Amino acid sequence: MIAHLDGPHPDLSPDSADPGQIWALLDKLASSPAPPPYTTAVAGTPSGAARLHGWAELLTAPPGDLDPGIRDRLHELAELEATWPGLAHGDRIVHGDLRADNMVRDHHRGVTFVDWAHATTGPACIDAASLAPQLILAGHTPQKIARLLDEHPATATDPRATTAFLAALTGHWHRNARKPAPSGAPGLRAYQHRVATAGTALLTLRMNN
């Protein structure tokens, strides 16, 4: 569907009301199975989320710049990541790439998710958990976001899947951040390092809980 939306990207910072709207929209999407028209439209689309990984590769040759606390837990992280593909299936709507620049705060509709290039179905936790590191980058504390994931229906219903997904996602970021910079995207690797750090802070809290 193509629609005209009039407004800026939402503000994810702690002082903004936009994160509350976003979580309410995530609640709505995760509360019931995807409707038939949606499942028909995405049928046969492979889930990119199910293929996320990185820790197992880093375990074979740990980078010198890896935080010592993470280095000491590489075996545990690789094992946790390996459980994710078996948990990655579900019947909920999955956007698959939630960031502020894939949302618009329309003047009439409020916050709306856009750019559904990775749309598929899967467990309810994917979009909420993938948004969590973005909120930390926007200024929320890892402790606050960890509590939010513990309470949010999309991520609290199956905490094992949520933690496994976060492990796979952060491993993906850490692995990609250490690849050569692609031409035409000079800031990509620096961004990946930042979001990997944010995701790892959140993941560590969940693993220590």
Residues covered by each model-derived region:
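Active-site acidic catalytic loop and adjacent metal/ATP-binding pocket
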Residues: 79-126
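Hydrophobic packing residues in well-ordered alpha-helices of helical domains and bundles
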Residues: 19-22, 70, 74, 192
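Active-site activation/catalytic loop segments of kinase-like enzymes and analogous catalytic loops
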Residues: 125-156, 166-183
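A general structural signal marking secondary-structure boundaries and capping sites
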Residues: 29-37, 84, 139, 177-181
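Regulatory N- and C-terminal appendages and interdomain linkers associated
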Residues: 193-209
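Hydrophobic alpha-helical membrane segments, chiefly transmembrane helices and signal peptide h-regions
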Residues: 1, 25, 98-100, 105, ...
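ATP-binding pocket architecture of kinase catalytic cores
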Residues: 1-39
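An alpha-helical support segment within catalytic cores of ATP-dependent transferases
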Residues: 34-95
